[in-house]
């Protein structure tokens, strides 16, 4: 660290140079994040020095978080849901499994969770951090969780089931109603990871059931900083009842609130304010329009890829396209040389593209033109 500080102009010259080397979103088809809505940025800036970790000092900010959870809960068919704004899907998924452990009062050294093979890697982190085993159930032919395969992995030490609404690789939605019945039959905690799909599915023409409308669902991960167009980091963890969240309470006597339930201690209120602002600004109609545009662009991309002989692995369910290719990994590298960034799936291996709001029709036209040159 310097003895004497630099001037603002010199500092920002360095920062801007570094920022200029980042890939602009207009060249990115691999990410589930996008440019935040301008009102989200404005709200974030207004609350940048707030701390939800000490809500008695920031009661207004805490109220905004409470209202934000209410709006998201309403979207998920439970306006009375409780929860908090997290850093994102990973934290929310870890916390949900912490809740499941506390609810079961079991020996975590023997405990296990059953997840589909398509579950996010954050559950592997949770397994390591919490000291519980993770059992991965094979998928069906449409790359969804197979309830019968999940049932076969349940034993007396199983504490929770996980289902996904918008899988990271293929954008598939698990049969959550069936998994919900399975959870109830075995008296198990069911967590739904809707980090991506949570702000897509409710605004589709024929939305699949995935949320608190299903009796067995106890908690849901949903990320405003993905298709919710909030600033990063803005994740969400919602519970069916306050009693579920209360099992996470930790004494924090030196704070004005005395207890905490979140994983992070210090939490920026800017995340909650950003999410709340964009939810209020767009409303259901605004989100429906955004999702409709993304799905139309998904259709356009899927058709153009098929015209090049790249058939989809599955018909797109959400705004994610996966396409067969002779050498997906090699193709990804060739596209990166042209400053296009896509990803590849693992099982089966395919080219993967996420059609976020920044992936416009013009972006798709430019992308497919370059793809034709390297295919």
UniProtKB/Swiss-Prot annotation:
Domain of life per record: Archaea
Family annotation (SUPFAM superfamilies): PLP-dependent transferases
Keyword Cell membrane appears in the UniProt entry: no
Key word Lyase present: yes
GO biological process entries: carboxylic acid metabolic process; coenzyme A biosynthetic process; methanofuran biosynthetic process
One matching Pfam family: Pyridoxal_deC
Database matches in InterPro entries: GrpII_AminoAcid_Decarb, MfnA, PyrdxlP-dep_de-COase, PyrdxlP-dep_Trfase, PyrdxlP-dep_Trfase_major, PyrdxlP-dep_Trfase_small
A GO term for molecular function: tyrosine decarboxylase activity
Essential cofactor(s): pyridoxal 5'-phosphate
NCBIfam families listed in its UniProt record: tyr_de_CO2_Arch
Full protein name: Probable L-tyrosine/L-aspartate decarboxylase
Species, as recorded: Methanocella arvoryzae (strain DSM 22066 / NBRC 105507 / MRE50)
Gene: mfnA
């Amino acid at each position: 660290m310097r003895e004497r500080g630099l001037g603002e102009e010199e500092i920002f010259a360095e920062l801007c140079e570094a920022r200029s080397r980042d890939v602009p979103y207009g060249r990115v088809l691999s990410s589930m994040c996008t440019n935040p809505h301008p009102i989200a940025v404005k709200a974030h800036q207004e609350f940048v020095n707030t701390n939800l970790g000490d809500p008695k000092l920031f009661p207004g900010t805490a109220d905004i978080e409470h209202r934000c959870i209410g709006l998201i809960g309403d979207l998920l068919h439970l306006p009375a849901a409780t929860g908090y704004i997290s850093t994102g899907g990973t934290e929310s998924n870890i916390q949900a499994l912490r809740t499941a452990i506390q609810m079961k009062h079991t020996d975590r050294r023997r405990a296990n969770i059953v997840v589909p093979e398509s579950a996010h890697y954050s559950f592997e982190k949770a397994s390591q951090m919490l000291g519980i085993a993770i059992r991965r159930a094979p998928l069906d032919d449409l790359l969804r969780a197979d309830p019968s395969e999940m049932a076969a992995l349940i034993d007396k030490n199983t504490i929770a089931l996980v289902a996904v609404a918008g899988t990271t690789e293929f954008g598939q939605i698990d049969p959550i109603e069936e998994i919900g019945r399975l959870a109830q039959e075995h008296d198990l905690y069911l967590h739904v990871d809707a980090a991506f799909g949570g702000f897509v599915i409710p605004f589709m023409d024929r939305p699949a059931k995935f949320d608190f409308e299903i009796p067995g669902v106890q908690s849901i991960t949903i990320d405003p900083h993905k298709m919710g167009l909030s600033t990063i980091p803005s994740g969400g963890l919602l519970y069916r009842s306050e009693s579920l969240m209360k099992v996470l309470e930790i004494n924090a006597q030196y704070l004005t609130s005395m207890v905490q339930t979140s994983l992070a201690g210090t939490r920026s209120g800017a995340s909650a304010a950003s999410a709340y602002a964009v939810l209020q600004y767009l409303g259901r109609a605004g989100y429906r329009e955004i999702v409709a545009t993304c799905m139309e662009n998904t259709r356009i991309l899927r058709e153009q890829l098929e015209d090049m002989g790249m058939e989809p692995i599955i018909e797109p369910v959400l705004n994610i396209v996966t396409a067969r290719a002779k050498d997906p990994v090699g193709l990804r590298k060739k596209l990166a040389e042209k400053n296009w960034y896509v990803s590849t799936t693992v099982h089966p291996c395919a080219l993967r593209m996420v059609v976020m709001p920044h992936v416009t029709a013009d972006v798709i036209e430019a992308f497919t033109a370059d793809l034709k040159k390297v295919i």
